[in-house]
Amino acid sequence: MVDVKALEMKGISKSFGGVHALTNVHYNAYRGKVNVLMGENGAGKSTLMRVLAGVISSDAGEILIDGQPVQIGKPQDAKAAGVAMVYQELNLVAQMTVEANMNLGDEWVRSAGFVRIRDSVKRAQALLDEYNLDIDATAEVSTLSIAEQQMLEIAKALASDARIIVMDEPTSSLTTREVKSLFQIIHRLTSENRTVIYISHRMEEVFELGDYVSVMRDGQSVGEWPIAEVTQSSLISSMVGRDITNLFPKEHV
């Protein structure tokens, strides 16, 4: 059975001033799979995903979701297209509650008064409980630990009911127990036929979670492979652009 592409990004280019951040990048993500995106710092991974999330606009290229072209020029477009992104840096309002952060931008809840806010709190808590996230929906975000705030970022993506969820280094501030919980969430998402794009540099995560892996280098696509067809050495070689045996030349006795 051939895996179906949930996302195709074709010929994506982006420059900032005279700096080419992305050059003719092609990227695919497969439905119901964990699609790992790798590359050294500055390879263009986060920039590419910010294009998908509507945070920045590309200079060239097209995006297809489920085979249909979509125009994503702002975050609202990405949300409407079923895309959610969990950023490495926290994007929360510390003085607001967990529930309010999960529904940030949903004016239907805020404009309808106490009854809908109360119902929204119940829905938020139900979602947190459903995914075994030990967070109180009524708590102020400023009272949460950094790890709890990172899990809240993930909960925000879950609350949007997105079909494509991008996670940018999501385990960077998590404890071992929370990493295990995150992996369980990811497995559940893929079992629901949702697509996960997972940016990571941690090899153990890549091989534990990944179904496909794509590598970028210097703002360009290098390749895409089923995880079963790569090794740690081959991935490192793809990221750095040369055989890693050349990085540690043999000593002559």
Question: Locations of the language-model features?
Answer:
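Glycine-rich phosphate-binding loops of nucleotide-dependent enzymes
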Residues: 2-253
